Design a protein with these regions (language model features):
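Radical SAM enzyme [4Fe-4S]-AdoMet core and its adjacent flexible, acidic
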Residues: 1, 132, 136-288, 292-294, ...
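Alpha-helical membrane-targeting segments
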Residues: 1-31, 249-274, 346-366
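Conserved alpha-helical substructure of the radical SAM core
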Residues: 2-134, 217, 229
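Short, intrinsically disordered, charge-biased short linear motifs at domain edges
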Residues: 27-37, 265-271, 285, 321-331
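Cys/His/Pro-rich metal-binding microdomains
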Residues: 43, 47-50, 283, 338-341
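Secreted/processed peptides and extracellular or luminal domains of membrane proteins
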Residues: 48, 52-55, 288, 306-307, ...
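Flexible mid-to-C-terminal extensions adjoining Fe-S/redox cofactors in radical SAM and related proteins
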Residues: 279, 294-366
Length: 366
């Protein structure tokens, strides 16, 4: 099935259509925010993630090509996540398919910076393949020096991550579409030291500095691990973070835009942790989706509930996305049977919330 004309409408019109889809069930649209989890394999042994324990047959390039053809030109924002994506040797080709077929405005690559040889070999090709889109490379740093290595369960990760940042900066000199960010997961393992951590990481002068809260996710195998900081702990960390962000705003246009969304996200996340319920409507299952390494389609990675497998449905995203299983997932989310501060989905939710979007615009301008 090919995407409908409405799926390719300009984003402002599609946002209105998603609101109608959420409230009335029509018009039915494919997701604008797509996350591709391309492997569970990972050399890290993070205190906040057990995804490496999962073993599945990863999608091939040909399977991605078939899937992308079923949603050609639809996603606005594509995130390529893992595991550690760089265990794959075909990333430049995958990103070329994303650019050629999906043609998103933004491509996001979160990475731990650990596999130096593979990164040096593949990152230049990824940057080249994404010309025409904005590429955001977010290097994950949760602590400083050996403390970071301890949280990530990988000796030497700190120094290797800094090397990845240096490589990205060299590539940025001739590739203005590349934005370099640093990303921190705030957990019970680092929340008390977070004010010091964020000061030192900001001193590295990334285009943007972002954080998200550690969550108990089905995808990550962390349900029951008690890694999420308390609402009080997070509020204290966010207070310092927001103050630092406002006093030292990014001069990079894309970096400033990301920071503006993040400033709103920090407030939203704090409210969700305090109230334990959705603060603004969630559009996971309507406007945002994730595809697992073996082709399962999820509305979100926190619940990681498969609404169908692409391998079993002819690699047709619409067939899975508009299935009875997907409708049941959407009904559950609309009934507010879940609530979480998942950062990726929250971006989309904020775009679809007049309250949040107004605050984001204010953050960008002031």
């Amino acid at each position: 099935m090919t995407p409908s004309a409405l799926d390719r409408f300009p984003l402002p019109l599609r946002l209105l259509a998603y609101r109608s889809f959420h409230r009335f069930g029509a018009p039915r649209l494919l997701p604008a925010n797509l996350t591709l989890s391309v492997t569970y394999t990972c050399p890290s042994r993070c205190a906040t993630c057990d995804i490496w324990q999962k073993k599945v047959p990863d999608f091939t390039l040909d399977e991605y090509r078939k899937t992308f053809e079923s949603m050609r030109g639809v996603p606005v924002w594509v995130t390529v996540s893992g595991g550690d994506q760089f265990v794959r040797s075909d990333l430049p080709e995958l990103f070329a398919l994303i650019r050629e077929i999906l043609r998103p405005k933004i491509v996001n690559l979160p990475m731990n910076g650990l596999l130096t040889k593979q990164i040096e070999k593949q990152l230049p090709g990824i940057v080249e393949a994404t010309r025409g889109s904005k590429l955001i490379v977010n290097v994950s740093l949760d602590e400083i020096g050996e403390r970071h290595d301890a949280i990530r369960g990988a000796r030497g990760n700190w120094e290797k991550a800094l090397g990845t940042i240096r490589l990205a900066r060299e590539l940025q000199k001739t590739n203005p579409h590349l934005t370099i960010g640093i990303h921190t997961v705030i957990s019970r393992h680092n929340v008390e030291r977070f004010p010091e951590i964020q000061r030192e990481l900001r001193a590295l002068r990334p285009d943007s500095y972002i954080t998200e809260v550690a969550e108990e996710r089905v995808e990550l195998g962390t349900v029951g691990k008690r890694i999420t900081p308390t609402a009080e702990q997070y509020a204290g960390a966010v207070k310092d973070l927001v103050s630092a962000a406002r006093n030292r705003r990014s001069r990079h246009p894309m970096g400033r835009l990301v920071e503006s969304f993040r400033l709103e996200y920090y407030d939203l996340c704090r409210e969700i942790l305090e109230r334990g319920e959705q603060v603004i409507p969630c559009y996971a299952g309507w406007a945002s989706a994730q595809i697992s390494p073996d082709g399962h389609v999820w509305g979100c990675c926190v619940r990681a509930e498969s609404v169908g497998n692409l391998r079993e449905n002819g690699y047709d995203m619409a067939k899975v996305w508009f299935s009875p299983e997907a409708d049941r997932f959407r009904k559950s989310v609309a009934a507010r049977e879940c609530a979480c501060p998942l950062a990726n989905a929250s971006y989309t939710n904020m775009l679809l919330s007049p309250r949040s979007l107004t605050r984001v615009a204010r953050n960008y301008l002031w």
